[in-house]
Amino acid sequence: MAGTGNSTAGIQQKRLKEARLQLGLSQKQLGIAAGLDEFVASTRINRYELGIHAPDYPMATRLAVVLNVPVAFLYCDSDEMAQMILAFHRAPKTRRRQAMAALQSQG
């Protein structure tokens, strides 16, 4: 099923490709690092990125680990929220605590 618009598959394909390119990985490199057989790795990641297939949750989790992004980033439908998730994930623990305290105090 092709992923376009606001479908979950479409969201994953955009975020997956964005994170992969940011790390400078080929589709094959990402697939192999996530545990796919080297002979299908490139094709499988290509199909995920094109929205032909969507990875199941265990595969999405493995891809997220390789890409150093939280799995929530791959499923986020808002660009702004996706960037916040990524920034929070990459921030040092003390900064995360400060950010949480600031956000909770304004609630």
Where are these regions (language model features)?
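DNA major-groove recognition helix of helix-turn-helix
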Residues: A34, E49, M59, Y75-S78
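Hydrophobic micro-packing sites on short alpha-helices
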Residues: L30, M59-L67, L74-Y75
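Residue-level recognition of specific faces of alpha-helices
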Residues: R44-R47, F73, A87
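Short, basic-rich loop-to-helix N-cap that marks the start of a DNA-contacting helix
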Residues: G24, S42-T43, L50-V65, M81
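A short, Lys/Arg-rich alpha-helix, primarily the initiator
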Residues: M1-Q22
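Interfacial/linker helices and their anchor residues that mediate assembly or domain coupling
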Residues: D79-G107
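Short alpha-helical DNA-recognition segment
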Residues: L23-R47
